Design a protein with these regions (language model features):
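A short, conserved alpha-helix in the catalytic core of glycosyltransferases
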Residues: 167-185, 190-222
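N-proximal low-complexity "stem/linker" segments adjacent to membrane-targeting elements
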Residues: 1-26
Length: 333
């Protein structure tokens, strides 16, 4: 295991935001020891060419199996660095991002994940403002260390430990202790596939780390900014996708071995299934930022999420086998 931070960006055919993200990493006050771009099932050579021509110090690899968590696991295998700091291609890292991450992990070997404060890069459009009003990726100004701080109230409510999987950060800026995550089996490749499950890999690994007895630190000194989607429909779809993926992840957790107790998982799953209805009532009273039609769709998405994980596992296996088959044909041919 090599000391230091590898900053990893998983991307697919998005050269313009990727260029901006890479520039933010090149401008760190304490630069990461390594910067890695994982090009996930690209449609052409544009990303590879851009990295080669404009960022010669950045390492490029191509992961042929489509799916964000295939790309994340590829990053874990590609680097030998102790810490892998994942950042989405639509994120701009603050100048102290990498250094603050390194400082957090130096506090204790028990810390497996560090998340940070993610603010909006722009609030120019109605879609961006709606996403931020719904909560965005902000998690506040107070440092949180789990499980030590688990008895704090989350959004004013006492909650089970699994609730912190959505209350302590976001995958758009998430750093992990590489060996620990590999020992836990890596990211779940059945999540973040697009349809039927377009998210959930970050929530799943946050929960599995907590359930395994490791620590997570949310440190607002780890600062980044995220470019929210500009159109209202796109922002609403992202919110709905998040809720469907959350329910699928919770349903998976409810039937998986659980060291910290299944009752809290089941209780939180039941609450999240009911919550869109509660929000709809709040909206009718004028107290929820999302329109009523979006909350109705959210409720339906949550219930569909209950049965999505099994289908997503089958899809992940088909994608894996398809790529393996093409490789075997190429070698044999």
């Amino acid at each position: 295991m090599t000391p230091g931070v590898c900053a990893a960006i998983c991307t697919r055919d998005r050269t313009d935001p990727l260029r901006r993200a890479l520039r933010s990493l090149m401008g760190q006050t304490r630069e990461p020891a390594e910067i890695l771009v994982v090009d996930n099932a690209p449609g052409g050579p544009a990303t590879r060419n851009m990295v080669r021509d404009e960022f010669p110090g950045v390492r490029y690899v191509m992961e042929p199996v489509p799916g964000l968590d295939f790309a994340r696991n590829r990053a874990l295998r590609e680097t030998s660095r102790e810490i892998v700091a994942f950042m989405d291609d639509d994120v701009v890292a603050g100048p102290g991002w990498a250094g603050a991450i390194r400082d957090v992990f130096r506090e204790s070997e028990c810390i497996a994940i560090c998340t940070g404060k993610v603010e909006a890069l722009s609030l120019e459009t109605e879609g961006q403002r709606l996403f931020e009003a719904n909560g965005g990726f902000a998690r506040g100004e107070e440092r949180i260390r789990l499980p030590a701080d688990r008895k704090r109230r989350l959004h004013g409510m006492p909650v089970p430990l699994i609730a912190w999987s959505i209350g302590v950060g976001s995958g758009c800026s998430l750093a992990v202790r590489r060996r620990t995550i590999l020992d836990l089996g890596g990211f779940d490749e059945a999540l973040d596939l697009g349809h039927p499950l377009p998210g959930g890999g970050d929530l799943d690994i946050l929960w599995r780390v907590l359930d395994a007895g490791y620590e997570i630190v949310y440190d607002p000194a780890v600062q980044a900014r995220h470019e929210h989607r500009r159109e209202v429909e796109a922002s609403v779809n992202q919110i709905l996708d998040h809720h469907r993926s959350l329910i699928a992840m919770l349903a998976k957790a409810a039937v998986s071995p659980c060291r910290t107790g299944r009752i809290g998982v089941l209780a939180f799953l039941a609450w999240r299934l009911m919550k869109p209805g509660v929000r709809l009532l709040s909206r009718l009273a004028g107290r929820d930022p999302l329109p009523a039609w979006a909350l109705v769709r959210m409720w339906g998405n949550c219930w569909r999420g209950l049965g999505s994980y099994a289908a997503a596992r089958r899809l992940a296996e088909r994608r894996r086998n398809a790529v393996s088959g093409r490789v075997a044909e190429a070698v044999g041919g």
